[in-house]
Every structure is written in C-alpha cells, then in structure tokens.
UniProtKB/Swiss-Prot annotation:
Belongs to the bacterial/plant glucose-1-phosphate adenylyltransferase family. Its EC number is 2.7.7.27. Involved in the biosynthesis of ADP-glucose, a building block required for the elongation reactions to produce glycogen. Catalyzes the reaction between ATP and alpha-D-glucose 1-phosphate (G1P) to produce pyrophosphate and ADP-Glc. Disulfide bonds: none annotated. This is Glucose-1-phosphate adenylyltransferase. HAMAP family: GlgC. It comes from the Bacteria. Alpha-D-glucose 1-phosphate binds at Y107, G173, E188, K189, S206. The lineage of its organism: Bacteria, Pseudomonadati, Pseudomonadota, Gammaproteobacteria, Alteromonadales. It catalyses: alpha-D-glucose 1-phosphate + ATP + H(+) = ADP-alpha-D-glucose + diphosphate. The gene is glgC. Pfam families: Hexapep_GlmU, NTP_transferase.
C-alpha cells in the first residue's frame, strides 16, 4: 500500500515548531538524563517521532525542533533519523536549541521559546505557524486543523479534546466555547475545571497544539515580551489576553482517518507511560504501529533480528503477547506481555512479565521481574526479584509508582549513569 502523502497550498505555507525542551518531572529518574521528548516509546521509537511523523504524514515539510533541557540525546536522534530532507526542495527539520538570541536568559516559557526564534521563522516566510507540543504520543492529520483555521478566518486555533474533569484538574489548560467553537474563556491548569456543554464529567482541554497566522503571532509575542509580569506562556498569558478582541477558535481532535478512534496519550507519569506501552500489546491496539497508511518514522539502527534460543523443558526461550525489537536475544527465558526495546538480552531461567524494558538492558539468570520499567543500560543481577514485593523494591532503592509500577535505573543499581 502506498503511504505517499501530498502537500497542499496550506501545508506548503506552514512552518511547524515542535516544543521539545521539557523535562517531564513527573517521570522522576526516567528523565534525569534525557528530555521527555527523547524518552523511548513503543519498542523502537522516541516520543518526538510522533509529532514529527504527524508533520510529515500531513504534508508539512518545514519543521523546527526547539530544545533546551538535557538535549544531547534528542538532538542526536533527530539528526540521525530526520536529516534526510532536501533543503533545495523546501524541506527541512532543524534543531533550534536555546541560544539567548534576544536576552541573556534561556527559554522562559512556551511563548518565549517561539519569540526567541522569530528571526528563523521569518526567514522561512510562512503564512501560518503551527506550534506543537513534543511531549505527547498521538496521531493527528494537521491538514484538517489547517483547513478549519483558514475556513473560520481565525487568528489562532487551539487543538482540543475532551478529558475527564478529575484528570484535567491541575494538568491541562481548559477552555469554554460557543456553538461555533469560538473560545470564550481559557484557564491554564485550573484546580476546578469548567465542564463541557452538556457533559458535567468532562471538560474541553488544550492539547498544547496551536495554529497562528504568522504576523498575528509575531505581534502577540512582541507585546508579551514587553510585559514584565508575564510568565511567557501561551496558556497562561497569550491565549487569555487575546480571546476577547481576536478570532480564537477551538479545533476538536479527530482521527487521521474516518471511522477510527482518535489516539492521544499523555505519558507524563510512570503509570501512564507504562500503561500506554502495555496498550500496544493488544491484538487491535488503539495506536496501530503497523498501519502503513500513517507510518511512524524514526532512526533505523542496523541491527540483527531478534533471536530466541533453547527449547528444553526447563529452559525455553520464548516471548508471548509481547513486542520484541531488533537485536534482542531471549536465551532460555520467558517474556510475557512486555515491550522489549533494541538489544535487550534476557538470560536463562529468567521471567519478565508486564514490563517495559528499554534498550541495552541485560537481565541475568534466575531473575523474576513483573510490572516494571527498566531504564536503558540496566544490568539486572543474577537472581534479582523485582515487582513482587513493593517494600523489598523500595529497600533496594527502586521507585514504586502510585499504581505499583517499579522503576529501575542504572544509578539505582550502582552502575555508571549518563545513558540517554
């Protein structure tokens, strides 16, 4: 099946800016050495691959990736996996690190991150600027957002989705809209969100994806830069300041294809990160990584196929209901309902269940592991038991999440740190 995507005048006139500088502090030690957008997901990808793939699949070929916090692995990944675009054809994916272009400060907020790159955006001469969050895993055709923005005559359009009020409280920007989806009110991360029309248990939450007419965006950023009391944030400052006098609309998040449920996940906690990976193991997952109509692009390492060795009664190498990536060796061990990233080795007589195992992990013999996240490069000592007794896990120095997922990192195992 062909997966060629075609550009339109709207996408051709659009420059996308992905904000990828966040740490993701609720992921604790998992982001000690990498920015959240550089975090692994789905067996072989990183979170940044999803908004980037959405851009390419939507026909948007000019993209800037804004980086700040511990960005080395993110920059390296984007350069390796996304450097094949042809500038002479108007295609590019560029890295935009914090570089104190307009002041001695680093990026102070989401709006400031865009403001400090105005000269780079202006050089591209876009009619529209799309500002995207690099923190979420989702599949979205931005062409629909562009079409709705142009048709409505909006100055700014905010992508939104309905989420439970309890989930949105303190975590999402929440908006009020009229019957035409014009935004009438906006609060950034309220503790008591206002509910959606006709649905007292749900609210309309911002996805952190914004579309602007370029000159309108520049005008608002310049005004905000002169406001000494501003937090330099789109949700806290820019949107509340413009909704009364300008055309600001909401765009409901939709699937990239008709008759399919839209997929969006906030993987900002250990539990949500673990759960989103576990969902991929379903026979018909909400996010189908095997859909050729909407491929997820990434850096393709040259690795040998996964291998499963030994077939004795007491030592059988096998994986059931799992994702096992390139370079993995399951040597006389059992893996069930788990996601194994590249070059993981599970040695004889070990059992790994319901776990997310990041690249380069080695599980030595006679280990028992369940409901765990093993960070990149961990070497699990022979005979270690993880996830069966939370008190014992904590005594070993591991972190146990609210819902009982155990995080293990190299530092917790006394190994040299710095894996990204």
């Amino acid at each position: 099946m062909s997966n060629v995507r075609y550009t339109s005048n709207l996408t051709r006139e659009t420059y996308a800016l992905i904000l990828a500088g966040g740490r993701g502090s609720r992921l604790h030690e998992l982001t000690d050495w990498r920015a959240k957008p550089a975090l692994y997901f789905g067996g072989k990808f990183r979170i940044i691959d999803f908004p980037l793939s959405n851009c390419i699949n939507s026909g948007i070929r000019r993209v800037g990736v804004v980086t700040q916090y511990k960005s080395h692995s993110l920059i390296r990944h984007v350069m390796r996996g996304w450097g094949h675009f042809k500038k002479e054809l108007g295609e590019s994916v560029e890295i935009l690190p914090a570089s104190q272009r307009y002041s001695e400060n680093w990026y102070q907020g989401t709006a400031d991150a865009v403001f400090q790159n105005i000269d780079i955006i202006r050089h591209e001469l876009p009619k529209y600027v799309m500002v995207l969050s690099g923190d979420h895993v989702y599949r979205m055709d931005y062409a629909g957002l562009l079409a709705a923005h142009a048709e409505s005559g909006a100055d700014m359009t905010v992508s939104c989705l309905e989420v439970p009020i309890a989930e949105a409280a303190g975590s999402f920007g929440v908006m009020e809209v009229d019957e035409e989806m014009r935004i009438l009110g906006f609060e950034e991360k309220p503790q008591q969100p206002k509910h959606s029309p006709g649905n007292p248990e749900m609210c309309l939450a911002s996805m952190g994806n914004y579309l602007f007419n370029t000159e309108f965006l520049f005008d608002q950023l310049k005004k905000d830069a002169l406001n000494e009391s501003s937090d330099r944030d789109f949700g806290k400052d820019i949107i509340p300041a413009i909704i009364e006098k300008h055309n600001v609309f909401a765009y409901p998040f939709k699937s990239a294809f008709p008759n399919e449920q839209a997929y969006w996940r906030d993987v900002g906690t250990l539990d949500s990160f673990w759960q989103a990976n576990m969902e991929l193991l379903s026979p018909t997952p909400a996010l189908n990584l095997y859909d050729a109509k909407w491929p997820i692009w990434t850096f393709q390492e040259q690795l040998p196929p996964a291998k499963f060795v030994f077939d004795d009664d007491d030592r059988r190498g096998m994986a059931l209901d799992s994702i096992v990536s390139g370079g993995c060796i399951i040597s006389g061990a059992t893996v069930r309902r788990s996601v194994l990233f590249n070059e993981v080795r599970v040695c004889s007589y070990s059992l790994v269940e319901d776990s997310v195992v990041l690249p380069d992990v080695v599980v030595l013999r006679h280990c028992k592991i369940k409901n765990a996240i093993l960070d990149r490069g961990c070497i699990i000592p022979e005979g270690m038991v993880i996830g069966y007794n939370h008190d014992h896990d904590r005594a070993k120095g591991f972190r146990v999440s609210e819902k009982g997922v155990t995080l293990v990192t190299r530092d917790m195992l006394g190994l040299p740190v710095g894996y990204e």
